């Protein structure tokens, strides 16, 4: 047996979008208001990331990821620059005085003032805000520039933009590329006759069922990892109208290619999907996820 096409078509549908957008706008209004503790608040870039930004959210999703990016300063990686380029870089920029930790504390104080301290919880990677309908995971960060070239003029400088922040417990740095993730997801969706994102929603709903049945835990796979896993599946496997046939073919491809996980990349195309960093998945959990999907599929 396989999961009926009618059920898969329902699972492929997108959940609510307006309320998360309203929540983002509310948080932006709070952080940019005159009462805000943030310095240079006119240089903030506040945007959705994750499922709601990428249009892969499903019914019943409640966590809204909101990036609060300060462009007043930035982190950078200049390891790919030539010696003469690094010299120009060092002569161009001064050491920042408004550090990320000061920025994060200013964001926390402002959110606590606006929403009440009891509704603001400081997590390891984000600041959680509890509202009546949704939970917002606010991520204070600076821009991260991965420089590819650096000359005397702006025209001679090229970098890949991302974000960087640190964990609360150990102060470990996390670098990610949410805007790249979004752009490449849109491109793949267009190349696959707009079946890529609905298929992601199907896999997210299957994950939801697996957790409900206690076959896996939430820690085994995140929504981000599901998107990046499916990003590695060749486009032709998504270009199938019938959802049952499409999911079956994709699942078969993933099962046959588990030995190639080391070559898989994240949807942002800036790092490998599997590894030991905070931003990467481990192959054991991915194997478990695929095994349980196959079992769930065959037992339906």
Swiss-Prot record:
GO terms for biological process: defense response to virus. It comes from the Bacteria. Binds to and probably activated by a virus-derived, approximately 400 nucleotide RNA (called CBASS-activating bacteriophage RNA, cabRNA) that begins in the viral terminase subunit terS and extends into terL, as well as by a shorter RNA with part of the cabRNA sequence able to form a hairpin. RNA secondary and/or tertiary structure, as well as viral infection itself, are important for CdnE activation. Mg(2+) binds at residues 63, 65, 137. Keywords: Antiviral defense, Magnesium, Metal-binding, Nucleotide-binding, Nucleotidyltransferase, RNA-binding, Transferase. Its EC number is 2.7.7.-. InterPro entries: NT_2-5OAS_ClassI-CCAase, NT_sf, Polymerase_NTP_transf_dom. One of its GO terms (molecular function) is metal ion binding. Binds 1 Mg(2+) ion per subunit. Its cofactor is Mg(2+). Belongs to the CD-NTase family. E01 subfamily. Cyclic nucleotide synthase (second messenger synthase) of a CBASS antivirus system. CBASS (cyclic oligonucleotide-based antiphage signaling system) provides immunity against bacteriophage. The CD-NTase protein synthesizes cyclic nucleotides in response to infection; these serve as specific second messenger signals. The signals activate a diverse range of effectors, leading to bacterial cell death and thus abortive phage infection. A type I-B CBASS system. This is Cyclic nucleotide synthase CdnE01. It comes from Staphylococcus haemolyticus.
């Amino acid at each position: 047996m396989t999961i009926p096409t009618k059920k898969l078509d329902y699972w492929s549908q997108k959940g609510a979008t307006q309320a998360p957008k309203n929540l983002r706008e509310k948080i932006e209004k709070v952080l940019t208001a005159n009462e805000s503790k943030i310095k240079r608040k006119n240089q903030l870039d506040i945007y959705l990331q994750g499922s709601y930004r990428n249009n892969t959210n499903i019914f019943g999703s409640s966590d809204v990821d909101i990036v609060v990016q300060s462009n007043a300063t930035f982190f950078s990686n200049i390891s790919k620059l030539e010696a003469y380029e690094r010299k120009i870089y060092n002569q161009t920029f001064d050491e920042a005085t408004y550090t990320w930790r000061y920025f994060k504390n200013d964001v926390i104080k402002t959110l606590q003032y606006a929403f009440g301290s009891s509704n603001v919880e400081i997590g390891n990677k984000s600041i959680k805000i509890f509202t009546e309908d949704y939970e917002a995971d606010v991520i204070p960060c600076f821009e991260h520039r991965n420089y590819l070239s650096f000359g005397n003029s702006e025209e001679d400088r090229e970098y890949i933009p991302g974000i960087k922040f640190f964990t609360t417990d150990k102060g470990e740095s996390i670098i990610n590329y949410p805007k790249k993730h979004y752009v490449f997801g849109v491109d793949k969706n267009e190349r696959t006759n707009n079946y890529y994102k609905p298929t992601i929603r199907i896999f997210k709903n299957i994950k939801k069922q697996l957790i409900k049945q206690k076959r896996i835990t939430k820690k085994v796979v995140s929504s981000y990892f599901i998107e990046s896993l499916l990003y590695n599946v060749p486009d032709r496997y998504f270009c199938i109208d019938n959802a049952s046939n499409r999911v079956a073919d994709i699942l078969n491809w993933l099962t046959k290619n588990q030995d190639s996980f080391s070559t898989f990349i994240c949807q942002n195309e800036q790092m490998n999907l599997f590894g030991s960093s905070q931003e990467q998945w481990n192959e054991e959990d991915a194997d478990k996820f695929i095994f349980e999907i196959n079992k769930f599929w065959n037992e339906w």
